[in-house]
């Protein structure tokens, strides 16, 4: 009886899941947010502060916060961490010079108490650009295999075409079913 009640409750419970989208400036965070919400590319300018959109996938609601990635804004990322269930880190696969900065920011975030239960989705963006870093290279540079206390997934994508974005959302949906 308890299992039946739980399944019925899930059908009608429209809980919202908080997601933050972070990454260095010019990684493609805002483009990804608006691909999710409008399924189209919008002209963007550097995000000062944040953008927020509600995305509904199969009756599951995600409240997605796109947070500015400029160096001066990164110290304020932690103000968005409370109640976050998923962190999406967008990596510019063409930016070899700053991959170490991405790694530093990633591990700072993962050490924060408010994110201890958050799932981690890494979008390796701009995979359409010649000579970009592969998913394997990014995974190695970010030392993802050393992450033991968070569920994580890395997904190749191209924000401009939307390629790979649905697979990332599917991974997030699969993590919700496990809980």
Curated annotation (Swiss-Prot):
Lipidation (N-myristoyl glycine): 2
MF GO annotations: GTP binding; GTPase activity
Binding, GTP: 23-30, 66-70, 125-128, 159
Any one Gene Ontology BP term: protein localization to Golgi membrane
Superkingdom assignment: Eukaryota
InterPro entries, per database record: P-loop_NTPase (IPR027417), Small_GTP-bd (IPR005225), Small_GTPase_ARF (IPR024156), Small_GTPase_ARF/SAR (IPR006689)
Keywords recorded for this protein, A-Z: GTP-binding, Lipoprotein, Myristate, Nucleotide-binding
CDD domains: Arl5_Arl8
Family of the protein in this entry: Belongs to the small GTPase superfamily. Arf family.
Functional summary from the UniProt entry: Lacks ADP-ribosylation enhancing activity.
Entry protein name: ADP-ribosylation factor-like protein 5A
């Amino acid at each position: 009886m308890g299992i039946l009640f739980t399944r019925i409750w899930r059908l009608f419970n429209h809980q919202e899941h908080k997601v933050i989208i972070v990454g260095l400036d010019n990684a493609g965070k805002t483009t990804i947010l608006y691909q999710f919400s409008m399924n189209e590319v919008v002209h963007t300018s550097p995000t000062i502060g944040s953008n927020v959109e509600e995305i509904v996938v199969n009756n599951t609601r995600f409240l997605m916060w796109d947070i500015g990635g400029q160096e001066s804004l990164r110290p304020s990322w932690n103000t968005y961490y409370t109640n976050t269930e998923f962190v999406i880190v967008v990596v510019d696969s063409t930016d070899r010079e700053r991959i170490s900065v991405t790694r530093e920011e990633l591990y700072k975030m993962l050490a924060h108490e408010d994110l201890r239960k958050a799932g981690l989705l890494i979008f390796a963006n701009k995979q359409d650009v010649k000579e970009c870093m592969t998913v394997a290279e990014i995974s190695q540079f970010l030392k993802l295999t050393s992450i033991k206390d968070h569920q994580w997934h890395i997904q190749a994508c191209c924000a401009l075409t939307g390629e790979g974005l649905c697979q990332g959302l599917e991974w997030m949906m699969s993590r919700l079913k496990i809980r």
